[in-house]
Structure formats: C-alpha cells, structure tokens
UniProtKB/Swiss-Prot annotation:
Protein name, as recorded: Elongation factor Tu
Function: GTP hydrolase that promotes the GTP-dependent binding of aminoacyl-tRNA to the A-site of ribosomes during protein biosynthesis.
Positions of region (G5): 175-177
Recorded superkingdom: Bacteria
Binding sites annotated in the UniProt record for GTP: 19-26, 82-86, 137-140
Length: 397
C-alpha cells in the first residue's frame, strides 16, 4: 500500500482516554498508535512505556502528568491525551489543560463499571466533554456473551444517568493488549472499528473563527481626537471595522458600540480574528464608561451573570495552595479572563469543608455580574495567589 502523504487539510480532533485505573487506558492508547500505523502507515507507533511515564506539566500553577500522542486515520488527525493517575485526570479536565472534543471511555469487561468510571463520566459532563465512545476492553478474557451484554447495559445506564445518550453511544468490544501484541489480528480489526465509530460519532469541532465574536477587555486608553481604544486578545470569531458589538458585564445592561477602527502592531486592519491581539477604536464611548473585565461581543451572543455552579479543584499546599480547608460561605476572588470578582461559595449539602487537593461541585454567587458561560475556566485567588482552579458547569442566573 502506498504511503499516505501527510496533509494538513485533514480535520483535527482532540481526544482522550478516560476510565477506571487498570482498565487499560494506556494500553489502548499504545494499541491505537501501533494499529493505525500498521494498517495505514499513518502516524507513528508509540510504546506503552513512553506513554506510561508521562511528563509532568504545569498548567495554571498545578502540576499535572499527561501523555500526549498524535495519530491519524485516513479521514482525520487526532491529538490524544492519556493521564497516568486519577488525580491527573481530575486536574486535567477541570483546568482544561487538555481540551477534549470527545473521549474514549475504557471499561474492563472483567470488572464492569467501577468508581472512577462513574467519576470520569460525571467530570466529562461537568466540564463539557461533548461526546463519549466506549471501548469494552479485555474481552479476550470473557467467554460469556451474556456477561458482556450485562456490562454493556451497565455502562449505558451510567452514561444515561449523567445525561449522555447511553442508548445511542457506540460501544466497541476488544482487547487492547491483544491488539498491541498483533495489530494484524482480529483484535487489531477492533481498533479499526473503534476509529470508524469515532470518525463518525465525534464531530470535528467548530473552529474558533467561526464562533460569534468575543474579546475580553484588558486595557483602555483614549486617543485625543479619535476616541476610546479597548485592547485585548480576540478569544473567538471575527471583528470587522464598522461592526456594531456589545459591551457586556459590570453594568446594569449591555451597551451597543460601533467599532470604527481595528489596529494590530500599530497597523490598521480591516478585520481581526481569533488569536489576534488588537486595539479596537470605539465610537462615542468615554474612557470612564468602559473597564477591564468587560467583554466586547457580537450583539446578543452573551449575557452577564452572577450565579452559577462550578466544578473546582483545590490546590494542595505543595502546589502553592492553601494549608487549611475552607468552609461554606468562603469569599475569595474569582479570576475570569482578565479580571477578579469577589464571590461567595456555597458547598453541596452534607459537605462541611473542602481540603486542599479535593475536587468539589459548588455554587458561586458573584458581587458583580460578568460574562460567564458553561465551560469557561477560571481561577480562585486569595491575595493574588491561585488557590483553586475551576470550570463553569451550569448558569443559575
């Protein structure tokens, strides 16, 4: 078979393995790279040992071990993350260190769903992983068809419990270890089948430039005779000169403004797009009517809120976090995009306190309304140092 030439035109998808300890996440990751290389001569085979000794990274001051591998199918290019320990998964998913467009839930056919299977599904729901495909592993060790069906049913029920479409979720039965030992075998076929399902079931993500425009305001200054300039990095979408946008957050109601100029590196542009650091010249806005912490956004695309639920990871003392627990009613600063806002934490019923190193679902009530959306990452700070990292799960008001 002729070697497929690598083209950057393939859609790129971020994916990861989740599931209980020792159910075979890392073995599957290795088996995927080996099988896809063996079958299509695409990507490169990565050894189990290289994935298992994942390097430590620091994301928002938190130490996380994550292995990154890349591979491709005939249709797509994938970036895949695998974490060695359960704590790494929790941190990774909450900080968004490795964004996932979809996940492969690995569940051992010999054990069925276990506590971390449940916890990873819950985390996926909380942090906004949109799609899950299931790989039922170690099927070479189970002869009983009824047992396999029972485990499948349990996994589907668990997915449904956390608002994933359990009945429609693709489940592929296989053996990562057997596929790793012989990618040409029928077990290798199962890896190919898994990716046929993933290619079809997990859509390629919408590109940042296709989303509605949003730019957090970082700084504001006035240019005599020209007006007020707001600077910041365009988070998503495209901004064209003469667009009418809204200034949202920290005020009672959003305010419509017209962008009369877009400047980048002291050059004037017709338009700016996601990733650009720009200055936007705003017509008819006084210097004192706009401040850091507000956002410029496509009219009607976002709202400012004060109350939401969040999934939060509290830094350990060794990570520079608190040395003591905090309690219900704790009032730290919440750092969103470019600004700190004070807020109160309401802990779930039955949870008295939260220890450094814990993860917890909490309700947050901010003193000022700012633009927050489901899936938005934030830090919790005390006196300028980060003590926790979180992600918005649901908006309350």
């Amino acid at each position: 078979m002729a070697k497929a030439k690598y083209e950057r035109t393939k859609p790129h998808v971020n994916i990861g393995t989740i599931g209980h300890v020792d159910h075979g996440k890392t073995t599957l990751t290795a088996a995927i790279t080996k099988t896809l290389y063996d079958r299509y001569q695409l990507g490169e085979a990565v050894d189990f040992a290289n994935i298992d000794k994942a390097p430590e990274e620091r994301e928002r001051g938190i130490t996380i071990s994550t292995a990154h591998v890349e591979y491709e199918t005939p249709n797509r290019h994938y970036a895949h993350v695998d974490c060695p320990g359960h704590a790494d998964y929790v941190k990774n998913m909450i900080t968004g260190a490795a964004q996932m467009d979809g996940a492969i839930l690995v569940c051992s056919a010999t054990d069925g769903p276990m506590p971390q299977t449940r916890e990873h599904i819950l985390l996926s729901r909380q942090v906004g992983v949109p799609y899950i495909v299931v790989f039922l592993n170690k099927c070479d060790m189970v002869d009983d068809e009824e047992l396999l069906e029972l485990v499948e049913m349990e996994v589907r029920d668990l997915l449904t419990e956390y608002d994933f479409p359990g009945d429609d979720t693709p489940i592929v039965r296989g053996s990562a270890l057997m596929a790793l030992e012989d990618p040409k075998s029928e077990w290798g076929d199962k890896i190919v089948e898994l990716f046929e399902q993933i290619d079809e079931y997990i859509p390629a993500p919408e590109r940042d430039t296709d989303k509605p425009f949003l730019m957090p305001v970082e700084d504001v200054f006035s240019i005599t005779g020209r007006g007020t300039v707001a600077t910041g990095r365009v988070e998503r979408g495209v901004l064209k000169v003469q667009d009418e946008v809204e200034l949202v957050g920290l005020t009672e109601a959003p305010r419509k403004v017209v962008v009369t100029g877009v400047e980048m590196f002291r050059k004037l542009l017709d338009q700016a797009q996601a990733g650009d650091n720009i200055g936007a010249l705003l017509r008819g806005v006084q210097r004192n009517e706009i401040e850091r912490g507000q956002v410029l956004a496509k009219t009607g695309s976002v709202k400012a809120h004060t109350k939401f639920t969040a999934e939060v990871y509290v830094l350990k003392k060794e990570e520079g976090g608190r040395h003591t627990p905090f309690f219900d009613g704790y009032r730290p600063q919440f750092y969103f995009r470019t600004t700190d806002v004070t807020g109160a934490c309401k802990l779930p019923e039955g949870i008295e306190m939260v220890m450094p190193g814990d993860n917890v679902t909490m309700e947050v009530d901010l003193i000022n309304s700012i633009v927050v959306e489901e899936g938005l990452r934030f830090s919790i700070r005390e006196g300028g140092r980060t003590v926790a990292s979180g992600v918005v799960a649901t908006i309350i008001e």
